[in-house]
UniProtKB/Swiss-Prot annotation:
Component of the mitochondrial ribosome large subunit (39S) which comprises a 16S rRNA and about 50 distinct proteins. It holds the Pfam family Ribosomal_L36. SUPFAM superfamilies: Ribosomal protein L36 (SSF57840). The keyword Mitochondrion applies. Its main location: mitochondrion. One of its GO terms (biological process) is translation. Keywords: Mitochondrion, Ribonucleoprotein, Ribosomal protein, Transit peptide. This is Large ribosomal subunit protein bL36m. It comes from Danio rerio (Zebrafish). InterPro entries: Mitoribosomal_bL36m, Ribosomal_bL36, Ribosomal_bL36_sp.
Length: 116
């Protein structure tokens, strides 16, 4: 039962990687993230199949490259919650939705804010 779920998980990861590799519009960082999810999923699978397996960092490091540190720290795409909203640039604009005030920016999406 456990082996079947692990195999299913790996096939999903491979299909996801194939989709990432097929679309040329993704940047290189996106492709490296796909590789990192596959290698991260393959290590526990090998450890279950062969308990004496020890992952080789030499195998993982060329695949991950400089994005190895990005596995732990991923930027979130959420909104900042503030009590006093301000326009941070000329492109920012205010919107009132659901009784709250929001700031959106098409030029710099990191300027998104929500009144809290």
């Amino acid at each position: 039962m456990l082996l079947r779920s692990l195999v299913g998980s790996l096939t999903r990861q491979w299909s996801q990687f194939a989709r990432c590799a097929a679309s040329l519009s993704l940047p290189a960082v996106g492709a490296q993230r796909c590789l990192s999810t596959i290698t991260a999923a393959a290590v526990p699978f090998r450890a279950v199949v062969n308990p004496m397996f020890k992952p080789h960092t030499a195998f993982l490091s060329p695949l991950l490259g400089r994005c190895q540190q990005l596995l732990c720290v991923q930027p979130s795409a959420g909104m900042k919650t503030k009590s006093a909203l301000k326009k941070r640039c000329n492109e920012c604009f205010f919107v009132r939705r659901r009784g709250r005030l929001f700031v959106f920016c098409k030029a710099h999406p990191r300027h998104k804010q929500r009144q809290g």
